[in-house]
A protein has these predicted regions:
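A short gly/proline-enriched turn/hairpin at secondary-structure junctions
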Residues: 50, 56-67, 80-84
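Short, flexible active-site loop motifs that bind/organize anionic cofactors or intermediates
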Residues: 34-37, 62, 144
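Residue-level signal for alpha-helical context at structural boundaries
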Residues: 46, 53, 64-66, 73, ...
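A beta-strand edge to alpha-helix "cap/lid" segment located at domain peripheries
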Residues: 8, 12, 17, 23, ...
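Short, low-complexity N-terminal intrinsically disordered segments enriched in polar/charged residues
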Residues: 2-53, 161
C-alpha cells in the first residue's frame, strides 16, 4: 500500500515538474516573440514593457551593459527606432528555448534616416546585418538580453568606417 502511494506521489511530482518546465519554456518564447513584434511595430514603449525593471542589456560590440528598463529603452530601443524608423528585426529559423532562456539568430535591416543618440548624423544609407541574441526571462519578463553581431560590417554599410 505504501509503495502505491509513493509511486503515485512520485508520478504526480514528475508530471508537475514537466508541466512547469514546459510552461516556463512556452512563456519565455512567448515573451520574446511579443518583444520582437513590438520592435517591428516600432512601439518602443510596448517593447520596453517586456523588460524586467532591473533588466541587463548587453551589446557585445559596446562591451558595457546597460542596466534598468528605462535606460535600456532610451539607450537601445529608442536609439535604434529613432535612427532607423523603418527597422525590421527578422528572426531566422526557430528560436532555441531551454527553460527560461531563449536564443535565436536574426537579421536587422533598415535605412538610417534619423540621428543616433550619440549625435551621429543620419547617413541615409540602407543596411542589413546578421546577429544572434540570448534572452533570460524571469516571471514573464526579460531579465537580460545579450546581442552579438558584426558591428564593423554594420558601420561600414552606414559609411561610418
Amino acid at each position: 500500500m505504501h509503495r502505491r502511494q509513493f509511486m503515485t506521489a512520485a508520478a504526480l511530482a514528475a508530471a508537475s515538474l514537466t508541466a512547469s518546465t514546459a510552461f516556463s519554456a512556452e512563456s519565455a518564447d512567448a515573451v520574446v516573440k511579443a518583444y520582437v513584434e513590438a520592435w517591428n511595430a516600432h512601439d518602443s514603449a510596448k517593447a520596453a514593457s517586456y523588460f524586467a525593471e532591473k533588466v541587463v542589456y548587453y551589446d557585445a560590440s559596446v562591451g558595457k551593459p546597460i542596466e534598468g528598463r528605462e535606460a535600456a529603452k532610451a539607450g537601445v530601443i529608442d536609439n535604434f527606432l529613432n535612427a532607423v524608423p523603418d527597422a525590421v528585426w527578422k528572426v531566422k529559423g526557430e528560436p532555441i528555448v531551454q527553460g527560461d532562456r531563449v536564443a535565436f539568430e536574426w537579421e536587422f535591416s533598415g535605412t538610417n534616416t534619423g540621428k543616433w543618440a550619440d549625435g551621429t548624423a543620419a547617413t541615409g544609407k540602407k543596411f542589413s546585418f546578421a546577429g544572434a541574441s540570448v534572452f533570460d526571462t524571469k516571471d514573464g519578463k526579460i531579465a537580460s538580453q545579450s546581442d552579438y553581431y558584426d558591428a564593423l560590417g554594420f558601420f561600414k554599410q552606414l559609411g561610418l568606417m
